[in-house]
Structure formats: structure tokens, C-alpha cells
């Protein structure tokens, strides 16, 4: 090999190494981007009740504040031993706030309403219960036994935030909805009151736990 050829090879080598390094970096960035674009799997929880099990998928991507709040209550064991205290057939079942003696459990501060996520209160969806104040939801939730679109956000009017849906156990929801109900005395944070639509026999939420991804 001539001296000229050796010099050319010496000059070319850094360029080849630079091109190779650039290709490796580009490939690494592409792989990282592809991984970041992978959809994050929504968390799931199992609600065990005296009438059967209900599995829920939570919409962490659409209702992040509400899901985080709910999961904190789950992790704290807040729902264990509470009841479905309000059951209205062909409407919804509501629970997560009162023990078997209908005494309200203490909660953290309420959260902001996320009903602008435009998720609909269709049959089988999980939504936050609240008072007339849109930003008053804390721990109580309900499962829509039928589609209740009038509860949705509409025309600037806040609705009831949907943050999950039943993926297994809707038959249990239907069974609960058919239970005999009546009036019962309850102890709320604001004092004693009388509730309507309380199951004659308590339907207890034995536990709510996260499911492995």
C-alpha cells in the first residue's frame, strides 16, 4: 500500500467512527422513543363484597386526580368494611363512605371535579359521588347500573366524574341493585339524618385491593 493510500485511510477512519457512533445514537433514541410511546396499562382493582366480586379498570389517563385519590383510599384500607348504603334499581349503587352501622368514615380533603374529561356515565362505569358542589367528591363512589348520561358534563355544567368501568362482575352489580331497600338512620359528618334506599340487609365491601398489572 502506498504512502498516499495510508494517509487517505488515516483521514477516513475518524469519519467512519463518527458515522458509526451517530448511527448507534440514532438507534438508541429510536428505541427509547418507541418505548415511551407504548401505552401505559391502566390500574385495576378488585372489590370484594358479600354479594360477589367486581373488577374495575381505572382510567388513570383520563381522570388522573380522581384515580390517584381513589387508589390512596384503597391503599389506606378506607373501603374495607364499608357498605353500599344507597341502592336504586335501574340507576346505580353507591358506597365507600359508611360502615355497617351507617356511621360516616372520615375522609381527606375533597378533590377537583374532572368531568370535563368527557367520559360518559354509561352502564358499568365507576364515578365519584358528591354533593351539589362540583368539587366536593372525597371517597364515595357509585357504579352506574344503567346509562345515566344526564350525569355527564354538559354545556359548561359540571357532571359526575367517571374514572373507571367494570370489566368483570357486572352481574354482581345487577344483583345488588335488586336488593330490598328502605329508610335508615345514619350518622354523617354533619350530624344524624335519615337515608332513603338503604339495603335492608347490609351489602358489605369486604375489601378493595389493587390487582397486579
Residue ranges and their predicted role:
Residues 1-6:
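Short, Lys/Arg-enriched N-terminal segments with co-localized hydrophobic residues
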Amino acid at each position: 500500500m502506498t504512502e498516499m493510500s495510508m494517509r487517505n485511510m488515516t483521514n477516513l477512519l475518524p469519519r467512519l467512527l463518527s458515522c458509526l457512533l451517530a448511527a448507534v445514537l440514532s438507534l438508541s433514541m429510536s428505541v427509547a422513543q418507541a418505548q415511551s410511546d407504548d401505552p401505559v396499562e391502566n390500574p385495576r382493582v378488585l372489590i370484594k363484597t358479600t354479594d360477589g366480586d367486581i373488577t374495575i379498570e381505572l382510567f388513570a389517563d383520563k381522570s388522573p386526580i380522581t384515580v390517584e385519590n381513589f387508589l390512596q383510599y384503597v391503599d389506606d384500607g378506607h373501603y374495607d368494611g364499608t357498605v353500599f348504603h344507597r341502592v336504586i334499581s335501574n340507576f346505580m349503587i353507591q358506597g365507600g363512605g359508611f360502615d355497617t352501622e351507617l356511621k360516616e368514615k372520615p375522609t381527606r380533603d375533597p378533590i377537583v371535579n374532572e368531568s370535563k374529561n368527557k367520559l360518559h356515565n354509561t352502564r358499568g362505569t365507576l364515578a365519584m359521588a358528591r354533593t351539589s358542589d362540583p368539587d366536593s367528591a372525597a371517597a364515595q363512589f357509585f357504579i352506574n347500573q344503567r346509562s345515566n348520561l344526564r350525569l355527564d358534563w354538559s354545556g359548561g355544567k359540571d357532571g359526575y366524574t367517571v374514572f373507571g368501568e367494570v370489566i368483570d362482575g357486572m352481574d354482581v352489580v345487577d344483583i345488588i341493585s335488586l336488593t330490598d331497600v328502605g329508610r335508615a338512620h345514619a350518622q354523617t359528618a354533619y350530624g344524624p339524618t335519615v337515608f332513603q334506599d338503604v339495603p335492608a340487609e347490609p351489602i358489605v365491601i369486604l375489601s378493595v385491593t389493587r390487582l397486579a398489572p
